[in-house]
Amino acid sequence: MNKFASGAGAFVAVCAGKSNVSARAGARMTGTDFTANDLGILTAHLVLAAEAAGLASCILGWRNEKKLCAALGIPEKTAIPVVVALGYPADGYEIRPKKRKSLEETFLVLGEPIP
């Protein structure tokens, strides 16, 4: 697990098991598996609910699924695409500045010229 998150009060493992028959049929008919969308929506709501409750959160992308499954008693065929660390931030903790592309480099409005 990420060392900076080792002091978190709790971790939530967001799991993805085998989808049901109707979900698989829908994925075949549309050519789209909505599992990632659903997990993203779930994770976003989890983070927003935590913030509303006064908790800080960090979505962790780096994880060892095999070790997590063993530690949590989760069948190995179950995917754990996301882990969220939750806890109260340390007094005076400042979020480090992120290095990200500008909105103009990542956002496109249909009908507008590409920059």
Feature roles, as predicted:
Residues 45-46:
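Aromatic/hydrophobic pocket-lining residues that form π-stacking "cages" and hydrophobic walls in ligand
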